[in-house]
């Protein structure tokens, strides 16, 4: 007897979704191997809860929301940047293919989105608090920032530092703001302090720190040597270098080539270090922003957990970068 002889009996079977199906679907996400508890957005979220005092069960749900969204953004970033390595391993789309990795990234985002309803019982005023708008607004901001950055890269248009900071505020800032806005909505404190000026600085700090770290040999084993040159990406130090000596087209010419060889990338790095002093400028900016963040933290009464996170920001050149 064919299954088509009584097709209506097949519908319950068709609707079934097994654990083995789920495992297959999320394999690129699982392969990424992220311990979300140790990822920066989760660590910052837990530190900021010092001011919001959200109960642990609700905090756990928030972490279950931001973890997959952050991971999905990394999966998509690697595709859009045509990266080869992450954490020293081949990127997910080189193993599972672009199509499956995109599908997985989209799926885990929707899966995280479904968890938002689990936060409703913790709301003081569920009828006036729209948690879904928080998620939608920040995911939209993330895509806006990413889209502008891709536009700069693909059109070989170097932004100003101010434009770059606005892009970071959207792309990187959204990953930090999303969980903190959820904390704010669920806060057990009647009048929590305004932590968002500090939070926005933290997002900028860690993005610029990542930009300068990507030029360090220590980063090679994780992502490859100076991959921003290979990707044609306008990172913070690269932007400064292009703008600092507009009469010299060396760096723009190298970015146009998107070189894979180390010799060309070392030449670009040497130009940035010696000619335009862009590494020194970047560390100077990091030092100034870190000081501003620490001052803002003091105004909020201090937070030992967040202070420890800020100490991870390196504000002076490493010997390895200096040797370059």
Curated annotation (Swiss-Prot):
Pfam families: polyprenyl_synt. Keywords: Lyase, Magnesium, Metal-binding. One of its GO terms (molecular function) is lyase activity. The lineage of its organism: Eukaryota, Fungi, Dikarya, Basidiomycota, Pucciniomycotina. It catalyses: (2E)-geranyl diphosphate + H2O = linalool + diphosphate; (2E,6E)-farnesyl diphosphate + H2O = (6E)-nerolidol + diphosphate. Its EC number is 4.2.3.-. This is IDS-like terpene synthase 3. Belongs to the FPP/GGPP synthase family. Mg(2+) 1 binds at residues 77, 81. Terpene synthase that shows monoterpene synthase activity and produces linalool, using geranyl diphosphate (GPP) as substrate. Also shows sesquiterpene synthase activity as it is able to convert farnesyl diphosphate (FPP) into (E)-nerolidol. It comes from Melampsora lini. GO terms for biological process: isoprenoid biosynthetic process. Mg(2+) 2 binds at residues 77, 81. Binds 2 Mg(2+) ions per subunit.
């Amino acid at each position: 007897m064919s299954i088509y002889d009584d097709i209506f009996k097949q519908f319950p079977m068709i609707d079934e979704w097994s654990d083995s199906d789920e495992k297959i679907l999320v394999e690129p996400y699982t392969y990424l191997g992220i311990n979300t508890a140790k990822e920066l957005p989760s660590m910052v979220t837990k530190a900021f809860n010092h001011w919001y005092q959200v109960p642990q069960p609700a905090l756990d749900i928030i972490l279950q929301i931001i973890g997959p969204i952050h991971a999905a953004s990394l999966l998509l970033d690697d595709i859009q940047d045509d990266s080869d390595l992450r954490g020293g391993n081949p990127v997910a789309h080189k193993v599972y293919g672009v199509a499956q990795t995109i599908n997985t990234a989209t799926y885990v985002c929707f899966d995280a989105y479904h968890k938002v309803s689990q936060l409703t019982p913790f709301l003081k005023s569920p009828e006036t608090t729209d948690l879904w708008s928080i998620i939608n607004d920040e995911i939209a901001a993330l895509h806006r920032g990413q889209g502008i950055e891709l536009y700069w890269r693909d059109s070989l248009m170097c932004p100003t530092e101010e434009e770059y900071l606005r892009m970071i505020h959207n792309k990187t800032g959204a990953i930090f703001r999303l969980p903190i806005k959820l904390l704010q909505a669920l806060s057990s404190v009647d009048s929590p302090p305004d932590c968002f000026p500090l939070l926005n600085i933290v997002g900028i700090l860690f993005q610029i720190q990542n930009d300068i770290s990507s030029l360090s040999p220590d980063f090679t084993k994780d992502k490859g040597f100076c991959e921003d040159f290979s990707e044609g990406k306008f990172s913070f130090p690269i932007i400064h270098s292009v703008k600092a000596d507009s009469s010299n087209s060396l760096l723009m010419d190298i970015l146009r080539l998107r070189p894979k060889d180390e010799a060309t990338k070392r030449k670009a790095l040497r130009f940035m270090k010696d000619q335009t002093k862009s590494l020194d400028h970047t560390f100077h900016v990091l030092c100034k922003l870190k000081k501003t963040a620490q001052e803002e933290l003091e105004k909020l009464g201090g937070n030992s957990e967040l202070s420890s996170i800020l100490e991870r920001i390196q504000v002076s050149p490493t010997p390895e970068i200096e040797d370059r």
